[in-house]
Amino acid sequence: MTGDDIAKIRAIMEMRNPEFAERIGISRQHLSDVETGKKPVSLKLQAKIFMNVIDTPEYRNHLRRLQNLTLQAKLS
């Protein structure tokens, strides 16, 4: 997982930096540093993102909605 991957996950969730950082239990600055590549993505951070974001019904619903929009755009 890279900082860019984390930024994409945050975008899928339609969350701003402060909200996402709070959800995964890190500071806004740390999240920004990770997303921009200034700090590495640790295994501990990956686990926090998985447990608090990816492995949730909310994330799956957002992802499903985006997939449906993409499919509709391709069919148009």
Where are the regions that the model predicts?
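Short alpha-helical DNA-recognition segment
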Residues: 14-33
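Short, charged recognition helix plus adjacent turn
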Residues: 57-76
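DNA major-groove recognition helix of helix-turn-helix/homeodomain DNA-binding modules
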Residues: 43-62
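Hydrophobic alpha-helical segments, especially transmembrane helices
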Residues: 11, 29, 45-47
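A short, Lys/Arg-rich alpha-helix, primarily the initiator
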Residues: 1-12, 50
